[in-house]
């Protein structure tokens, strides 16, 4: 698989218009691994439409807490959970990320508990790790180095 950047959405702001672009979200593909940058509305559908699988999803990076960058983070986490990736997904974002995810999971607790009981899924909190960052290098592996700065 070729290294590439896939643009899921390029529109600023959360308002949608017929025939318009989706809000901000991209996927950086390196050696077959997918790193999602921002989770604007539509990211989950665009991820699947691009032909990716949840097993390819390595990390999610949220650049800042505007709705056009994080509105569908919960949905992406949730669908990756029911898609049963073979590994933990790393999620990085600025201060407030853990609260955002915790509140989403709490809002879906009824459905999550039913799926754990009926479908035998593991706890959703076990499918990801969450790291809040400030500035500097926030992630580095053998394929990618990510540095955050205040703008």
Predicted regions: what they are:
Residues 1-151:
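Binuclear metal-dependent hydrolase catalytic cores
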